[in-house]
Amino acid sequence: MNHFKKIAGVLEAHGLDAVLLTCEANRFYASGFHSSGTDGAAIVTRNRSYYFTDSRYTEAAARYVQGAEIRQTDREHPYSALINEVIEKEHITRMGYEDEYMTAADFHRFSEKLHCELVPATELLWTLRAVKDQAELDCMIQAQRIAEKALADILGKIRPGVTEKEIAALLLYKMLHYGAEDKSFDPIVVSGANGSLPHGVPSEKPIQAGEFVTMDFGCKFGGYCSDMTRTVAVGHVTEEMETVYNTVLKAQLAGIAAAKAGVTGAAVDGAARQVIADAGYGPYFGHSFGHSVGVEIHENPNATPSNSKPLPAGAVISAEPGIYLPGKLGVRIEDVIVITEQGCQNITLASKELLIL
């Protein structure tokens, strides 16, 4: 799976002869091939595509990159020289670059050495990546199923005395065991008072009876991410715990019900936020309702209070409201939804009923 043709198809409308891809995520989106960090570059022109890498990846690139000419860089043939060869061959005068990713040092170096005008093109790439095709969705759904199987396997291990770190390690192992290529991000496992830390780091803290345990995790399949959060209780719950949990779930369902192509990200966020505010917990929901997911765990567009743009059909967005009472507890519930013309499709199947282990 690659998107060379999809990228090439929008260049003329944006007044570009080509686009230069240097960041790992955009290189993978275009080519379907992983090379780590800065070890690669690609140029997509209106008619042809080129993939540049060094000797460590040349053989693999030749095997897996379809629809692009492979060029090998080395000490005698640096990236700038190879890129200039393509610029001359393809008569490129205006080339897009990733202004939100490229470092100032790299931009300065390319600006000095490349024989064409460099034009910001991150927004163009974000717009393309926002709308997933069926092959991309299939990978994301498979990643989600793997994560759900991992969760089902480890629920029986969550009990008093087990540490947050141990639960995080089990999730990672199980996702790899069931076929994940990698984790989407470092898993978040927080319990009790640590639950009020939305992005808390799993610690040596033992889980205790009467606490919530929040697990935010995901994996990659086919280069695409999954993302989900479930909060479970251990032993028993108080009335307050149950109220907070049910409020978060009601807010999530309200946001999902509001999600539809053409609706703004702010409107989706607002539907969920209003539920939490009406329950008296407004100050304790500080982050946004959701972010897009794809090749990267955080993409665009987002369901945030500041996003006044309509969501496109085909966008894949997390739905993850939360309530965090400092020093006391936290609850977050997260699914991933696909925006459609009719509403949205929830690709997360794991139960959201309050589970008391």
Task: Show which residues each predicted segment covers.
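Active-site neighborhoods and metal-handling regions in enzymes and metal-associated proteins
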Residues: 1-357
